[in-house]
Amino acid sequence: MTAVAPTLAETGNALVRIDHVQLGYWVGERFHVAVRDASFDIAPREKIILIGPSGCGKSTLLKAIGGYIAPAGGTIAVAGRRTLEPGPDRAIVFQEFDQLFPWRTVLENVAYPLRINGRSRRDAAVAAMRFLALTRLDQAADRYPHQLSGGMKQRVAIARALALEPALLLMDEPFGALDAITRQRLQAELNGIVAEREVTLLFVTHSIEEALVLGDRVIVLGDAPSHVLEVVDVRDLGGPETVAYSQMRGRLRDLLRVEDDVAEMEDQAEHVDGG
């Protein structure tokens, strides 16, 4: 079930290629390393989960792949092109609910990136409605963000990201602030949408359960300054009741050094909240 991250020479069909990337930030005259050395590939239409301890650089690495942070070392390439800035081939969804424009309607929020990329108002609106229907929000097109629940706001953000028809969808703990029932519902919807649109997904989470529900492979990062501890294939495990699923959950807990009593409390809380 487990595998060491493949070397770059071993993967010839990668959409995303992370090659010995180092990331960090300056505090005065001192450079603090957040990600020491990360190398992995992502194949087209693959669902990759980044998981690791808090503060290990998961979100920093995601933003670097999105083109928002320049690596201090190594290279990031998408579709064979080195990533130096944001581009329409990548779209990102954050955790925060305030990522929508409060003065624009749901339809206008989704259409906005299409308009700034040169689409006519009519074409942008038609495309936006198509993706609102995909996320089951077409009936809320005329509402404003303050009239939406947290889950609905995240679905708008997903629709807006998908409207660009990116090759790579980047998601930074988008369901982390939602209640368990809404989170599980959106996880199921996301799996369906990604399969239908054939989008490549890179998803950051701190939840082992979420990683197992959403991922094809899970990339485990160590403590900061982090590196890739292991790349784990989580396909074909079956549901939570299977032995394979339980063994994989235990393996990921071991890699992340999660205490058994804390993990059990989280599982019990999710079971109660989820009904």
Language-model region placement:
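Conserved ABC ATPase "signature" region
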Residues: R115, R122-A140, G192
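Conserved ABC transporter NBD signature motif
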Residues: G74-P86
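Helix-to-loop junction immediately C-terminal to a conserved catalytic motif
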Residues: G66
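A short, flexible loop at the N-terminus of ABC-type nucleotide-binding domains that lies
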Residues: L8-L15, G24-D37
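Conserved signature/switch motifs of ABC ATPase nucleotide-binding domains
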Residues: R143-H146, L164
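Hydrophobic anchor residue at the start of the ABC signature
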Residues: I158
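Short coil-to-helix segment of the ABC ATPase nucleotide-binding domain corresponding to the Q-loop/switch region
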Residues: R104-A111
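Catalytic Walker B motif of ABC-type/P-loop ATPase nucleotide-binding domains
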Residues: L169-D172
